[in-house]
Amino acid sequence: GVANVVSALHQLLADFQVYYTNLRGFHWNIKGHGFFVLHEKFESMYDDAAEKVDEIAERILMLGGVPENKFSEYLKVAKIKEVSDVACGSDAVSNILETYGYLIGEERKIIELANEAGDDVTADLMTGYLKEQEKMVWMLVAFSTKGCTDK
């Protein structure tokens, strides 16, 4: 029921908080050829992640739960791990693609749980996230394709 949805949203909230912090680190520490493009892209991505953190926490409240707000608690349950010392754009993009793979899987599970609970709003929220993330995966894969040169 709804309790399962809330539990899954708690997990997603913790994961998004760690993902957000990783994106900040990528934004601050990126170096090299792709700096200008990636520095801006990572900023827009962490802004988007921050918005999703807020939406997820508010959804937990709407469903009668209480969202966690301590980072120490997020780190205890998050499946996404903190990343440090990433200055190379390709390493950052690889980490983001791996993270998206995980988040997309979790959001699909939440859609199933929400549908079982008759919670159309949460299912719709997650569907919106999937739509954005699948497009971002496509763009990041295209960006990181090796061997493409301008002629």
Give the location of each predicted region:
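Helix-loop segments that flank and shape redox-cofactor active sites
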Residues: G1-N4, Y19-S44, E106-V121
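Charged, amphipathic alpha-helical segments and their flanking helix caps
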Residues: F36, E43-D54, L113-L130, E134-M139
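Conserved alpha-helical segments that form or flank metal/cofactor-binding pockets of metalloenzymes
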Residues: G34-S72
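Hydrophobic stripe of amphipathic alpha-helices that form coiled-coil interfaces
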Residues: L23-F26, I30-H33, I56, L63, ...
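A structural signal for well-ordered alpha-helices, especially hydrophobic packing surfaces
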Residues: L13, Y20, H27, Y46, ...
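Acidic/histidine-rich alpha-helical segments that form the ligand environment
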Residues: D54, E58, S72-G128
